[in-house]
Regions:
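Structured interaction patches on ligand/partner-binding surfaces of diverse proteins
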Residues: 2-23
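N-terminal "domain-start" segment that seeds a small globular fold
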Residues: 17-53
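Thiol-/selenol-based redox modules, centered on thioredoxin-like
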Residues: 18-33, 144-179
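A short beta-strand-turn-helix
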Residues: 38-61, 78-82, 86
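Structural microenvironment flanking redox-active thiols in thiol-disulfide oxidoreductases
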Residues: 61, 72-116, 127-133
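Hydrophobic beta-strand anchors of alpha/beta hydrolase catalytic cores
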Residues: 62-63, 148
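Structural micro-motif
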Residues: 116-120, 135-149
Length: 179
């Protein structure tokens, strides 16, 4: 875990501005876990049950579990819209899943601007993908959404993000540019 510690004084009744620095590894991408690309989900557009691999093809992809009408998800989707062109230029599949049909029906992609055309929406059948994400990535609370992974079809995970994250789109692109 990359961390930075800075000591500073806070005087009574005063604001102390501090620059937040997100540390990042200067090294190459590292495999941080495993996730089965043969996991099945139900496509939202046609109701067909299919696998992540069949949807995205061989190679790297992004898979996420979203909580519709929840601020962390809304923020993440605006971050995704902000890097639409870069994600489309990358050319890989993005699978955005919802825990249930109600969640999908409550989701309106138009709320977030222009999202990448490489997105496939779907439903997580019986919560199997969410459970595997939580177990494989050792997430403390499987119900904290959204959860984003960048993985490949050899089942290697190189990025995970859960809950509220600042600059998710930029973080995804930093990893993608190193692949």
């Amino acid at each position: 875990v990359l961390a930075e510690i800075e000591f500073f004084n806070v005087e009574a009744d005063k604001t102390t501005p501090i620059q937040l620095e997100m540390r990042e590894s200067k090294d190459e991408i590292q495999v941080i876990g495993n996730f089965n690309s043969e996991n099945k989900f139900k496509r939202a557009d046609n109701g067909e049950e299919t696998s992540l691999l069949a949807t995205t093809g061989r190679g790297y992809y992004i898979v996420a579990l979203l909580g519709s009408r929840q601020e962390p998800t809304n923020h993440a989707m605006r971050d995704i819209a902000a890097v639409k062109k870069e994600l489309e230029d990358w050319g890989r599949g993005i699978v955005l899943l919802f825990p249930d049909e109600k969640g999908y029906k409550n989701f309106d992609p138009k709320e977030f601007g222009d999202l990448p055309g490489t997105i496939t929406y779907g439903l997580d059948i019986d919560g199997a993908i969410q459970k595997e994400m939580a177990t494989a990535m050792k997430l403390q609370n499987a119900n904290t959404l959204p959860i984003f992974l960048i993985a490949d079809t050899f089942n290697r995970v190189v990025f995970v993000s859960q809950g509220y994250t600042i600059g998710l789109g930029e973080q995804l692109m930093k990893v993608i540019h190193k692949l």
